[in-house]
Amino acid sequence: MHFADIPLSKPCLNNPPTYPWSSPILSSIANPSLCDIVSSPSSVSSFASSDDFAFMNAYCLPIQQNHQFGSPVAASPNQQPLVESQNRRNVTYASLVIGKLGIAQLIRQQTDPPQIIHRKQDKGLMARVLSRSKKQEERENHSSDARDAIKSALRRRMRRREGRVQKALRPTPNLICSKCNTTFNHSTALMMHEATCLNQVPFKLSDFFVEDVIDDWLF
């Protein structure tokens, strides 16, 4: 059977072709638009204006584009080497362009300023959230220690305050009379006592007894 006799509606299922555009890089890029991708204008324009899209077909047969009707037809045996070389050249060119487009798309995704800014903001927000949650967890784990420390600090403060109050409310020393050494708790009582005590004339009981004895002896 000749290649030209095989109908085009049945793709070759024995040995399916492996083309460069079935690489993983194209699976990660969903139909990139040429206007949004940073690439050289010459490659984009030449690739976009190419009329030979036979290499994008799923058939194993080498085909050529029928420009009159826009439908692919099988190549004749005489034109088969020329079509194969053209398809091979188109495949190479397509793989290079698609690789360039994919790399450009990836580079743009990584170097897009708004995305970088949002990524940094998200990282900063996540860091703040994690730090707050970590502090909250530490506070919950060590809440008893914190309460004990606060209570001890308050107790020390109350002791210092009580000491100052006790010093301020310390009672006055006892007041002592300079003549008879009598103690008093108030200065007014001491003054009244000294007014009478200092004006008294000193006397001895022996004087009274001696006078009585002399009077009795004389009479």
Curated annotation (Swiss-Prot):
Which is a Gene Ontology cellular component entry for this protein? Answer: nucleus
Q: Which GO terms describe its biological process?
A: cell division; negative regulation of transcription by RNA polymerase II; transcription by RNA polymerase II
Instruction: Report the stretches of sequence that form zinc fingers (unnamed).
Output: 177-197
Q: Which UniProt keywords apply?
A: Activator, Cell cycle, Cell division, Metal-binding, Mitosis, Phosphoprotein, Transcription, Transcription regulation, Zinc, Zinc-finger
One GO MF term on file is: SAGA complex binding
Tell me the function of this protein: Transcriptional activator which interacts with the mcb binding subunit complex formed by res2 and cdc10. Rep2 is required for the mitotic cell cycle start.
**Protein name per the record:** Transcriptional activator protein rep2
Upper taxonomic lineage:
Eukaryota, Fungi, Dikarya, Ascomycota, Taphrinomycotina
